[in-house]
């Protein structure tokens, strides 16, 4: 298990480390890389003003799902979900049913046996949208565009999908890329994926969740829970990903 998790963890590195970095000394050397430029473009698109913060069930969340689906198609990533994503409903107390969606892409593993086992990489589609606040005694509507939460995670998701598709010969297991809707509504998209949509949950060997990756400082956190294998991988890589030093947080 440690071996394939190591491959998965290393697949995350190219998002931050381009070929330029091998001769560089800091994050500044990454600024001109094609991958970083692509990530920035994704973040701009997914946090655009017209999406109004991608609130669960909103037109903005729908457009974000369509954007992720479009990127998967352009990158040659196969889709498990139908065009427009897989719809599901969330019952609201005393209100109408909220309709959200998941978009799931995949890159099939090369091993004839292990391709039936799965690694899941996921990121939430939605943010909190708009909120009315009181400023100087007057109601003011504020839009939470969600560049960090979670356009950053979605941007990495689609770029990782591209990289895994390009380097599919490295992956014995099938890798699923899941953009999950309605996370701010009791994580409904994740629940729907595990309990209604995907029939082979017992074959999922590892899962990485990408959330709020734009930390604003030179570092990132790896929340591994109680996964002993992943803890070992993070501890090993923390000494190798210069100048990146993951801080391990268990819970």
Where is each model-derived feature located?
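Bacterial Sec-dependent N-terminal signal peptides
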Residues: 1-22
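N-terminal capping segment at the start of a domain
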Residues: 22-28, 33-63, 75, 206-215
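Second-shell loop/turn segments in exported
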Residues: 24-33, 49-59, 89-94, 139-150, ...
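Extracytoplasmic/secreted proteins, especially bacterial periplasmic and envelope-associated proteins
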Residues: 34, 38-41, 45, 59-74, ...
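Acidic/His- and Gly-rich active-site-bordering loop/insert found
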Residues: 46, 72, 93-135
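A non-catalytic alpha/beta surface segment that caps or lines the substrate-entry region
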Residues: 54-108
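Alpha-helical metal-binding/catalytic segments enriched in His/Glu/Asp
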Residues: 114, 121-127, 131-186
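Metal-dependent peptidase/peptidase-like ectodomains
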Residues: 180-251
């Amino acid at each position: 298990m440690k071996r394939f998790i190591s491959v998965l963890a290393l697949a995350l590195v190219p998002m931050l480390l381009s070929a330029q970095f091998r001769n560089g000394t800091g994050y500044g050397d990454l600024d001109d890389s094609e991958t970083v430029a692509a990530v920035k473009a994704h973040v701009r698109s997914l946090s655009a003003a017209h999406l109004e913060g991608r609130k669960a069930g909103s037109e903005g969340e729908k457009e974000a799902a369509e954007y992720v689906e479009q990127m998967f198609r352009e990158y040659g990533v196969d889709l498990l979900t139908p065009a427009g994503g897989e719809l599901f409903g969330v019952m609201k107390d005393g209100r109408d049913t909220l309709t959200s969606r998941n978009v799931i892409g995949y890159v099939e593993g090369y091993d004839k046996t292990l391709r039936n086992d799965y690694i899941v990489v996921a990121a939430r589609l939605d943010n909190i949208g708009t909120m009315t606040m009181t400023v100087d005694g007057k109601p003011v509507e504020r839009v939470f565009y969600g560049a960090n939460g979670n356009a950053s995670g979605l941007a990495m998701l689609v770029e990782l999908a591209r990289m895994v598709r390009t380097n599919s010969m490295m992956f014995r297991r099938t890798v699923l890329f899941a953009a999950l809707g309605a996370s701010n509504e009791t994580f409904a998209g994740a629940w729907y994926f595990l309990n209604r949509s995907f029939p082979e949950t017992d074959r999922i060997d590892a899962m990485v969740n990408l959330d709020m990756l734009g930390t604003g400082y030179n570092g990132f956190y790896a929340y591994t829970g109680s996964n002993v294998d992943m803890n070992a991988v993070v501890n090993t890589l923390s000494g190798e990903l210069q100048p990146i030093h993951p801080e391990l947080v268990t819970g």
